[in-house]
């Protein structure tokens, strides 16, 4: 397929949001075909468009790519956001996995059972403050550059910014003790493509509300 990438997901962040972020940071316009009903999802499956009967799925360069990490790897490689050599890619992958682990922990809180929410929220705060943010503060200090890896923008900078914005929504006080991360957030947010994506009216999705959660439950049956 030629033209803009087409993203298939429902109208929420979920596991597609990091893909939206990376495309936007690369300056790539994309279209979205939103899944709004169980029938929409079933049609994608019956038409053979979902390799593992799961979304996210992205149509790009004649392919129908599934699996979030595979999609991110392809976009990062295509738009030169994956470092200059194997060593940089190894660091990018390592940092990205940690970022995605914490991101998943935070975004899953909105759909966890009420009787588990307090414990899982406490765990997420502890992991944020005592494991993940200290690790990335240390990376920025030791690397001494504007970016996490090398001396230019890579996918991991975008993933980290997205995470920091989630942390800020979750509990802004968690960022208080991390001056380098706060400076990083401001710096990456000021990049033209990123700044544009942060503006109202972009394809960036807001935090899920109760209505969206209920709609997602109906579509994905969780």
UniProtKB/Swiss-Prot annotation:
Pfam families in the record: GST_C, GST_N
Family matches, as Gene3D superfamilies: 1.20.1050.10, Glutaredoxin (3.40.30.10)
A single GO cellular-component term on record: cytosol
GO MF term (any one): dinitrosyl-iron complex binding
Domain GST N-terminal, residue spans: 3-83
Reactions catalysed according to its record: RX + glutathione = an S-substituted glutathione + a halide anion + H(+)
Binding-site residues for glutathione, renumbered to this chain: 9, 45, 54-55, 67-68
EC number: 2.5.1.18
Keyword Transferase in annotation: yes
Keyword vocabulary terms for this entry: Cytoplasm, Transferase
Domain GST C-terminal, first and last residues per copy: 85-208
Subcellular location: Cytoplasm
InterPro entries: Glutathione-S-Trfase_C-like, Glutathione-S-Trfase_C_sf, Glutathione_S-Trfase_N, GST_alpha, GST_C, GST_superfamily, Thioredoxin-like_sf
UniProt modified residues of type N6-succinyllysine: 4
Function text: Catalyzes the conjugation of glutathione to a large variety of electrophilic compounds.
PANTHER family: GLUTATHIONE S-TRANSFERASE (PTHR11571), GLUTATHIONE S-TRANSFERASE-RELATED (PTHR11571:SF233)
Misc note: In addition to its enzymatic activity, the homodimer of Ya chains, called ligandin, binds various organic anions, xenobiotics, and azocarcinogen dyes.
Family from the record: Belongs to the GST superfamily. Alpha family.
Protein name: Glutathione S-transferase alpha-2
Source organism: Rattus norvegicus (Rat)
